[in-house]
Design a protein with these regions (language model features):
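N-terminal subdomain of nucleotide-sugar transferases
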Residues: 1-63
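Active-site loop signature of alpha/beta-hydrolase-fold enzymes
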Residues: 12, 43, 77, 144-145
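Short glycine-/acidic-enriched loop or helix-start segments at secondary-structure transitions
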Residues: 15-16, 47-48, 81, 122-124, ...
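A conserved catalytic-core segment of Leloir-type glycosyltransferases
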Residues: 37-102
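An aromatic- and histidine-rich active-site surface loop
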Residues: 85-100, 110-131, 137-140, 144
Length: 147
């Protein structure tokens, strides 16, 4: 089985409960699942030097080849809520395109989507509808001020 992840954040970013995702990914790899991740270049909780380093890393492989991570360019996360909303929207647009048309994504059997930012679920539902693959929506860390 091959699992597609369309994530707003991915290591080395500082996001809520990073060990939960890392443990899940390790368990999936240990169970023999292949994973494909599309995520923006890191921005949250890292130095500018690390961000610059990752601008050159468009593809990484983890878990002895079981996980392929593809990163795409996107503006850095800011404190301004309008810019943050713009960033999330642009990320979802890019992930919809990647999840629908990218070669590695087209080989996936199922999608696993986190619930933050809240518009991730809507984007994933569109990918599911177009691709006709199952979707696991991991609902957590939703607070009223997020909506």
């Amino acid at each position: 089985m091959k699992i597609l992840f369309l994530t707003a954040y991915f290591s080395p970013e500082q996001a809520a409960s990073p060990y939960l995702g890392e443990n899940r990914n390790q368990a999936f790899a240990d169970a023999g699942f292949d994973m494909v991740v599309y995520s923006p270049i890191p921005t949250r909780g890292i130095t500018n030097e690390i961000r610059q380093e990752y601008k050159k890393k468009k593809h990484e492989v983890f878990f002895d080849g079981k996980m392929n991570v593809y990163r795409f360019n996107l503006i850095g996360e800011k404190k301004n809520p309008v810019l943050r909303a713009w960033r999330y929207t642009m990320s979802c647009v890019k992930q919809f395109v990647k999840g629908t048309f990218a070669k590695d994504a087209r080989l996936c059997d199922i999608m696993f989507i986190a619930s933050t930012p809240p518009i991730q679920g809507a984007m994933a539902a569109l990918v599911k509808k177009v691709r006709r693959i199952p979707l696991v929506y991991n609902l957590q860390d939703i607070f009223p001020d997020s909506l």
